[in-house]
UniProtKB/Swiss-Prot annotation:
Active-site residues from the entry: D22, H168
PANTHER family found in the cross-reference section: CHITIN DEACETYLASE 1-RELATED (PTHR10587:SF133), GLYCOSYL TRANSFERASE-RELATED (PTHR10587)
Major localization class: cytoplasm
Catalytic activity, EC: 3.5.1.-
Domain NodB homology positions: 15-207
Species name: Azorhizobium caulinodans (strain ATCC 43989 / DSM 5975 / JCM 20966 / LMG 6465 / NBRC 14845 / NCIMB 13405 / ORS 571)
Gene Ontology process terms (BP): carbohydrate metabolic process
Protein name: Chitooligosaccharide deacetylase
InterPro entries: Glyco_hydro/deAcase_b/a-brl, NODB_dom, Nodulat_NodB, Polysacc_deacetylase_ArnD
Site feature Raises pKa of active site His, where: D142
One Pfam family it belongs to: Polysacc_deac_1
């Protein structure tokens, strides 16, 4: 399935599910996510904000060393639908240069638009840079800090072969004031500890995006 040209579900491998994390890297959350995944030999994809990757390059490198994929999530996380063409290109290309400097040329192959806000202009830039646009098919809205059991149920009730699950290991720069109010992704980490083995028990392999 795709929406405006971006992948929302992967159909090639029916035994896999793809957990993705937006808005990192974050110094307290991203390493904790990696530790949970490592404990279960699970892999994921991290859509990282360029300015945070520049600030915490060692975390991005560790994600890469652990076998995870890293995707482009712009440099500052603006809503690109509201921006002129030059700003759209700057946000995507600047993040790409930053991430390639950390991870190596050719490693970052996917792009996700902030807020899932796509346009033909955005897709044109993404295609020009050579990235694959990616959306999601399961969104438990963990950024709203729901109850842990609700977060778990939303993921497990909607997970299907090829599902792309959206979670967050950070927050956009302009939403930092809400970080502590919303629990600093504590609910996401708690849910992840349950969801990862539960999905594996159903026979799914948790893989990075192809």
């Amino acid at each position: 399935m795709s929406v405006l040209g971006q992948a929302a579900r992967i159909t090639q491998n029916q035994s896999s599910i793809y957990i993705t994390f937006d808005d990192g890297p974050h110094p307290s959350v991203t390493p904790a996510v990696c530790e949970i995944l490592r404990e279960h030999s699970a892999l994921a994809t991290f859509f990282q904000i360029g300015r945070f990757a520049k600030e915490y390059p060692s975390i991005s490198r560790q994600c890469q060393l652990d076998g995870h994929a890293i995707g482009n999530h712009t440099f500052d996380h603006p809503n690109l639908q509201d921006r002129a063409g030059e700003e759209v290109e700057y946000q995507i290309s600047s993040a790409q240069k930053c991430l390639e400097h950390i991870c190596g040329r050719g490693f970052v192959r996917h792009f996700r638009a902030p807020y899932g806000a796509w346009s033909t202009q955005i897709l044109n830039v993404v295609n020009k840079i050579g990235l694959r646009p990616v959306s999601w098919s399961v969104d438990p809205r963990d950024w709203e800090a729901p109850r842990i059991e609700n977060l778990i149920n939303e993921i497990l009730d909607n997970a299907r072969p090829g599902s792309i699950i959206l979670l967050h290991d950070g927050c956009p720069p302009d939403e930092a004031a809400m970080w502590d109010v919303r629990g600093g992704r504590a609910q996401t980490l708690a849910a992840l500890r349950y969801v990862v083995p539960a999905l594996q028990a159903r026979g799914f392999a948790l893989q990075p995006l192809p």
